[in-house]
Amino acid sequence: MDKLEEIFDLQDALNKRIGVNTDGMSEEDKAKWVLNYTRAMQQEMAELIDSVPWKWWAKYQEFDEQNAKVEVVDLFHFLVSIAQVLGMTPQDVYDAYTKKNKV
């Protein structure tokens, strides 16, 4: 099993533990969960932004690299969940990613 497959398996198990089963979702549920996860990603992105000194008007800011790494992983959790809601496998993600990089 490769690392991406393991991540997908771990995310599937986590989602099921918290009550989200992506197997056989209706179109309505898929739309709901894509929106839920996208909103969650917006929040995580805001937290990532707050990890960097972006406030040009504030004097004492530091780059919190450790927190930035945590937020990247949080974003990845939700991104993998969206892929799963859409029925994408690790291979589907890999294929789409490599195809997009050929552009």
Predicted regions located by residue number:
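Flexible "arm" and connector segments at domain edges
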Residues: 1-103
